[in-house]
Amino acid sequence: MAIVKCKPTSAGRRHVVKVVNADLHKGKPYAPLLEKNSKNGGRNNNGRITVRHIGGGHKQHYRLVDFKRTKDGIPAKVERLEYDPNRSANIALVLYADGERRYIIAPKGLQAGDVIQSGPDAPIKAGNAMPMRNIPVGSTIHNVELTPGKGAQLARSAGAYAQLVARDGAYVTLRLRSGEMRKVLSEGRATIGEVGNAEHMLRELGKAGAARWRGVRPTVRGVVMNPVDHPHGGGEGRTSGGRHPVSPWGVPTKGYKTRSNKRTDKYIVRRRNK
C-alpha cells in the first residue's frame, strides 16, 4: 500500500493525496452478493431532511458483508481483496470449502490465498472469528458483537480495533479506540486482528468535487445564514454569532454531553477520553 501525493498540474490536483493498494481486485464485484442501494438525499419518508450534507454522488451497489461469521468449522480461502464504496475498510471475497462465497471485512495483513476459519475451535490468527470467551486476554480484535448473534457492531471501520483486557463471568471488558472501557457478553463473536486499510485517514480529496462524487454536500456556517435558519444567523455585516456555538437546533456544540442512553450505562466501565 502506497501514499501518493499528486503533482500540482491543476488546482484540483494540487492537494490530492491518494492511498494506492495494488493488491485490490481491478474487475467487477461478485454479482450474487450485490444489492440495490437507493439514495434518499438524507430525507425521511416525509421528505424532510433528517441528515444534513447528503445528496448526489455516484451510483453504488451494496455489498452483502458477513458480519455474523457463523459458518463454524469450515475453512475458507481468501480469493481476493476488493474496494467497497460503502465503507472505509476494504473487503475480502472468501470461498468456503462447501462452495459458498461470502464477503468479510478485510483485516490487516490478510492476503489472497490465506485460509481463515470461524468457530470456538478456530486458531488465534488474524481473520479468524470466534466467541470472545475463547479469545485470550490482551488480544487485539475487531468486528465485535454487542448482542450475540446480531452481527458485529463495534470496530468495523478502516484501522479500527479493540483490546480484550479482562474476563469476568458472562462478560468480557474491552478497551475501545476512544479510550472507553466497556463490558460485552462473552458469547458474542469477534474477529482476531485489526481492520486493514488504516492509511485511509491519510487521504486528501483535494477538491470539493471529489466530496460530491461521494455524495457529500457542502456545509454552510451558521453565521452566514438568516435568523430563521440558525441561532447564529442575522446581524448587520459580519458577526461572531453573539453566543456560544450551537447547532441549528440550539444544542451546544463544544464539549456538551448529549449521551442519554441510561439503559447501557451499567456496561461502561470508563467513559471515553476527552
Swiss-Prot record:
InterPro entries: NA-bd_OB-fold (IPR012340), Rib_uL2_dom2 (IPR014722), Ribosomal_uL2 (IPR002171), Ribosomal_uL2_bac/org-type (IPR005880), Ribosomal_uL2_C (IPR022669), Ribosomal_uL2_CS (IPR022671), Ribosomal_uL2_dom3 (IPR014726), Ribosomal_uL2_RNA-bd_dom (IPR022666). One of its GO terms (cellular component) is cytosolic large ribosomal subunit. SUPFAM superfamilies: Nucleic acid-binding proteins (SSF50249), Translation proteins SH3-like domain (SSF50104). GO terms for biological process: cytoplasmic translation. Residues 223-274 are annotated as: Disordered. GO terms for molecular function: RNA binding; rRNA binding; structural constituent of ribosome; transferase activity. Keywords: Ribonucleoprotein, Ribosomal protein, RNA-binding, rRNA-binding. Pfam families: Ribosomal_L2, Ribosomal_L2_C. The keyword Nucleus does not apply. Belongs to the universal ribosomal protein uL2 family. One of the primary rRNA binding proteins. Required for association of the 30S and 50S subunits to form the 70S ribosome, for tRNA binding and peptide bond formation. It has been suggested to have peptidyltransferase activity; this is somewhat controversial. Makes several contacts with the 16S rRNA in the 70S ribosome. NCBIfam families: rplB_bact. Part of the 50S ribosomal subunit. Forms a bridge to the 30S subunit in the 70S ribosome. HAMAP family: Ribosomal_uL2_B. This is Large ribosomal subunit protein uL2. It comes from Vibrio cholerae serotype O1 (strain ATCC 39315 / El Tor Inaba N16961). The lineage of its organism: Bacteria, Pseudomonadati, Pseudomonadota, Gammaproteobacteria, Vibrionales.
